[in-house]
């Protein structure tokens, strides 16, 4: 990979506890240290922003169950909060690493019974990912890594997450996203990610 005037977006996706945060950090470190590239790393949803705080309140403190349409509109607004920052980095040649992005909106929205065309419209003005990598692991593996956050708002947690995983794999095949076995060590996963990134760019 060589530094260009216009940067790239690499998105890491997958169910909760699949290792996205760790791998995003490792990838960012590798690109800076070994390839001497500028990187920017974003974790979504960002619960520290104004909209993010609304999402957190809506998920955790609302008296009624979360309405899927309202929730996905809020998630979209959360992404739009950082759109200008993403574009700034891209225009400056950065590699932008996304820990979740609009792909999660499509997958979770689909599992929540929402229309995928409507979901796509929500993000049509967001910068597009140049590479999307799915970190795939069965729920039986990820549930041993800790308690998922806000994954069970629409039904039993395990059943819901299994549907999300199936949707990620189905959409990955359709959209030509890369899929990595995330049941292995973080070092093995990192090596696979680097191989994919180097081959892609």
Language-model regions: role of each:
Residues 2-3, 26-30, 140-201:
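NTP-dependent small-molecule kinase module
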Residues 12:
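Hydrophobic anchor at the beta1->P-loop junction of P-loop NTPases
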Residues 15:
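P-loop (Walker A) phosphate-binding loop of NTP-binding proteins
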Residues 18:
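ATP-binding Walker
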Residues 21:
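Walker A/P-loop
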Residues 29-39:
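Post-Walker A helix-loop "phosphate-sensing" segment adjacent to the P-loop in P-loop NTPases
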Residues 37-121:
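ATP-dependent small-molecule kinase phosphotransfer cores
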Residues 100, 105-166:
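A glycine- and Lys/Arg-enriched "phosphate-lid" helix/loop adjacent to the NTP-binding pocket
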């Amino acid at each position: 990979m060589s530094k260009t005037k216009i940067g790239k977006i690499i998105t890491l996706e997958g169910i909760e506890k699949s290792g996205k945060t760790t791998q995003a950090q490792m990838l960012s470190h590798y690109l800076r240290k070994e390839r001497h590239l500028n990187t920017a790393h974003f974790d979504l949803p960002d619960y520290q922003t104004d909209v993010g705080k609304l999402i957190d309140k809506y998920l955790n403190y609302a008296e009624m169950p979360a309405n899927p349409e309202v929730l996905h509109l809020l998630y979209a607004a959360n992404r739009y909060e950082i759109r200008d920052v993403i574009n700034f980095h891209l225009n400056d040649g950065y590699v932008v690493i996304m820990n979740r992005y609009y792909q999660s909106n499509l997958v979770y929205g689909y599992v929540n019974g929402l229309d995928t065309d409507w979901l796509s419209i929500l993000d049509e003005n967001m910068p597009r990912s140049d590479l999307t990598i799915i970190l795939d692991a069965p729920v039986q593996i990820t549930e041993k890594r800790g308690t998922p956050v806000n994954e069970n708002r629409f039904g039993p947690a395990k059943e819901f997450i299994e549907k999300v995983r199936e949707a990620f794999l189905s959409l990955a095949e359709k959209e030509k996203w890369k899929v990595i076995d995330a049941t292995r060590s973080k070092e093995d996963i990192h090596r696979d990610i680097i191989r994919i990134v180097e081959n892609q760019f």
